[in-house]
């Protein structure tokens, strides 16, 4: 079972020492557990994923319009960035180069530095780069996604205000889209809930707040990650409510919705679910 609103950002989390969102899927032996989940007789499992939803929301929220347009046109953003890295056209056949592009797009949007990027490339993609190359990748990402960098800075200012709200300051929108409102209480989300940072204060190494796990360090890039995850969770949650009008979702795995359907109605169910998940939310109608 999943725990509703188990994470700080509102995402579901595991419970009873099991997290169905993180079942192994690559290792042949370990993925046997995932493969053991079967539908009833004469039924099928339908898994529909909102592709790259957090990466899409990030550039949309930042107002990085050129990158938003790539998603809107259905372009491969991993290949696009890899083409910039290698100064030549990269496509899906160039698996190693595309993997570098993918790791950068998914890993550098929240302020990751060159040391961590170097480790992630080796761990997730089996690609080793030296320190100079890792620094170049980080620099290139930030040049291409300059509005994302500005969003980190904007969130740093939001932390400062939330920690000590100026007497003459009115609530204000964070990022583009007018879906996030910075208030003394925290950051108000489109569904009316808040991302909060209890007892937020400026420490010797930056801002920090209290949580059930202890004292947590926080900065603009991490705030961006928080709000992007929260917005993605709202998108999926609203889609599940609409899907539930005709078909019952049985599981959500981060950005995916899982339903069970009879074999006879599988295509109709799939078309219905995909239609809903291809529709932008009312509070972000221009989200690709």
Describe the predicted segments one by one.
Residues 1-92, 154-256, 263-264, 270-277:
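Acidic, glycine-rich two-metal-ion catalytic cores of nucleic acid-processing enzymes
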Residues 55-60, 103-110, 143, 226:
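Short, hydrophobic/amphipathic alpha-helical patches that form generic packing surfaces
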Residues 58, 116-129, 141-146, 257-274:
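Catalytic palm subdomain of template-directed nucleic-acid polymerases
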Residues 81, 85, 100-116:
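Core structural elements
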Residues 86-98, 125-138, 285:
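Short, surface-exposed acidic
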Residues 94-104, 247-248:
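Alpha-helical scaffolds flanking conserved acidic
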Residues 133-164, 264-288:
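Polymerase palm active-site segment centered on the conserved acidic dipeptide of motif C
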